[in-house]
């Protein structure tokens, strides 16, 4: 509740209500009295998202939101980020190396190489680009090589 105490003029009751609402939104309503060490990695990620959205931000910044998670939990986190982005009408910026996440929730993709913008486009445009840095990074995965070939054959 620290951010609410610092930046919002709300009563204790209103703050508790807001925290409970946000915890319910990220499916952690029964975990509000647990210590961080008692939470799984996926639960800790959801707590981080809850802490970020409790203040109704205009922007949500996520740094490697799926790192250290199993594939199923990573998909749950991606879905949660997408739902919250849509529901709260906020701009979300995600820094990730996970191309599955990029393709699932990225509207606009900016590819950085050595800290410099190397390419910008949509998830569909990723499959069409000839940008060497993007092709090398994205298609290091056999799955994405197959997806690209299927996409290019489909658009002929």
Where are these regions (language model features)?
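Catalytic Walker B motif of ABC-type/P-loop ATPase nucleotide-binding domains
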Residues: 60-63
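Conserved ABC ATPase signature
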Residues: 35-39, 43
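A short, proline-enriched helix->beta-strand linker immediately N-terminal to the Walker B motif
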Residues: 54-58
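Helix N-cap at the start of a conserved alpha-helix in ABC-type nucleotide-binding domains
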Residues: 71-73
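Conserved ABC ATPase "signature" region
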Residues: 12-30
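C-terminal boundary and immediately downstream tail of ABC-type ATPase nucleotide-binding domains
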Residues: 124-156
């Amino acid at each position: 509740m620290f951010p609410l105490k610092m930046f919002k003029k709300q009563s204790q009751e209103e703050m508790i209500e807001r925290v409970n609402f946000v915890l319910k939104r990220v499916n952690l309503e029964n975990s509000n009295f647990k210590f961080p060490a008692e939470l799984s990695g996926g639960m800790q990620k959801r707590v981080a998202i809850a802490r970020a959205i409790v203040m109704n931000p205009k922007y949500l910044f996520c740094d490697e939101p799926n790192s250290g998670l199993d594939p199923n939990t990573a998909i749950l986190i991606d879905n949660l980020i997408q739902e919250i982005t849509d529901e709260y009408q906020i701009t979300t910026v995600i820094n990730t190396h996970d191309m599955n996440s990029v393709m699932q929730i990225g509207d606009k993709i900016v590819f950085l190489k050595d800290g410099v913008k190397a390419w910008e486009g949509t998830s569909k445009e990723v499959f069409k680009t000839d940008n060497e840095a993007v092709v090398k990074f994205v298609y290091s995965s056999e799955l994405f090589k197959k997806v690209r070939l299927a996409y290019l054959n489909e658009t002929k």
